[in-house]
Amino acid sequence: MAHNTTRRDFLKASVAGVVGAAVGTRAIRLAAQGGVADRLAVCSWSLQPTSADDLFTKLAATGLKRVQIALDPIRSNEGGGWAGFGGRASKQGLTLVSGMIGTVGEDYSTLDTIRRTGGVVPDATWPETWKNIQADAEVASALGLALVSFHAGFLPHEESDPTYAKLQGRLRQIADLFAAKKMQVAFETGQEEAPTLAGFLKKLDRPNVGVNFDPANMILYDKGDPVAALRTLGPWLRQCHLKDAVRTKKPGEWGEEVRLGTGEVNWKAFFQALDAVGFKGNLCIEREAGTQRVEDIRAAREYVQKL
């Protein structure tokens, strides 16, 4: 996810909901999926659904049947209709490729606000975030998911940083929760440079932890070249978000997210790098800006399919 709105606008915290029949399998869908077009999915939150029925309608309009599903609305039954979501999705012919969990109090207004409020970093929101994550893990398990992604927050560059050990502890706690349910977790990229994240993952030392790589986030946060970052993080790659952006001209400010294919991501080089690291996993189209989300996602799908 990126910056244009507070994540809690559509991922509200509440008591655990019920989810109904499980769908999917407990295996991250990798090499057997065929070409890129067969691995495309859409991020449910990009469609800004007001209810489960609204999500189904908008998904149909994108032309995609595979989805990374936001778990918080299911947990809280936000807008209604999420009870029994697994069974309903299956009847719609949908495949749930993974889940996404939010954290409490994230403010994407500026780079400074998200640095202070993002992920599992803030002490003030950690107890509620941890409670929600435990409930989301139950939702993900009931849906038969093999992978969930989330923003860990801004990670320290140096082990000597006083927050380094704290974040290692919290993220191991999350990793172990999902490992006990035979699931993997993936940190979303962008808030730190690739070598920093790679070093943090090595120190974390949890085999069920990897990366959800988002090339646009590397540009939005101004954290380096996406293709070079992808090569660095290849050993931890679990899933990709497909999104595009233009880098800021004012250091310390956000870049601009744009429709896929119109920004600064070199998509040909990006997919070549994916092939080079041997990644055959899910590619989830994400759009978090603009007022034409369905149209932009459909255009992104068509753009990628023509590459």
How would you label these PLM feature ranges?
Residues 45-52, 71-81, 155-160, 190-195, ...:
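Acidic-and-aromatic substrate-binding clefts and catalytic sites of carbohydrate-active enzymes
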Residues 56-61, 80-98, 137-144, 176-180, ...:
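Acidic (Asp/Glu)-rich catalytic clusters
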Residues 66-67, 99, 168-264, 271:
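Acidic/histidine-rich catalytic cores of soluble enzymes
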Residues 25-50, 54-62:
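C-terminal segment of N-terminal export signals and the immediately downstream linker at the start
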Residues 1-18:
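N-terminal secretory signal peptides and thylakoid transit peptides that target proteins
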Residues 48-59, 129-138, 223-229:
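Short, acidic/polar
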